[in-house]
Amino acid sequence: TWGSQSNVIGRYKDRIKRGKPVPDYAKDITKISQRDGINEETVFGEKGWAKNWGDIRKDCYFILDDGWDVGYYERPAVNISVFGSHILNETRFPSVKGMSPQERLKWLNDKLVANGWLGGALWISAQKFGENYGRNKISAENQIEFWKERIAWSKYANIRYWKVDWGIHCLDVGFRKMLTKLAAKEFPELIIENAYPALPANFINNIQFKDGKYFGDGKFANTPRKELDKLDEILEFSTLFRTYDTYGNSVTLD
């Protein structure tokens, strides 16, 4: 939903500039960001995203991207510790108010399946909820019980796909290996997509950013070996791998 979230917020900002009405939460143009574009109305409303894409829905997972488990206006640069709860936010999805975390996820998945999708999928922050940098950073081996519980929630809801993206441990190969193997043990049907945030792999050297695009020499041979070694290591244990990105125009379709 990340691209759709961007489109929604872009339209709201345009409407604000033209003096047109927008939802209450979107009225302060200084606060809203792409993360704020996902909620019950945009997903399940009369013109919600869950109703789009016709017959291909039965073969596709519907991924709720960054924002589904935090309140509005949250930013990792300001308060990264609020990310990673895995609890469908009731301000964004008021129908789940009063439900347990696992029941919220089941409600979400059931709604998506009822709309013709193969199932629901979740964007996941690569960190434990409440964690922070420095003294509050928690090692991968000390997070196992937390992740067992979150995997159990998804198992209860029959959510079978996680996109594990940015977070305090996003560049930590050991963390990604721990989580991937734990999911395989606790809930084998759960696909872990290791979405590794990195510069384009074919021109990490001599890279420039201009007019909204990346430019570089385009040669994989010029990429530092240690960077490619890290990608190789993640690929060894990954069911699914995503890198940002492999060529000059940054997308999230690799």
Residue ranges of model-derived segments:
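Catalytic domains of carbohydrate-active enzymes, especially glycoside hydrolases
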Residues: 1, 16-69, 153-159
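Active-site mouth loops of central-metabolism enzymes
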Residues: 3-21, 26-37, 132-147
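Intrinsically disordered, low-complexity coil segments
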Residues: 11-31, 47-50, 76-79, 92-102, ...
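Aromatic- and carboxylate-enriched substrate-binding clefts and catalytic-loop regions
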Residues: 53, 58-254
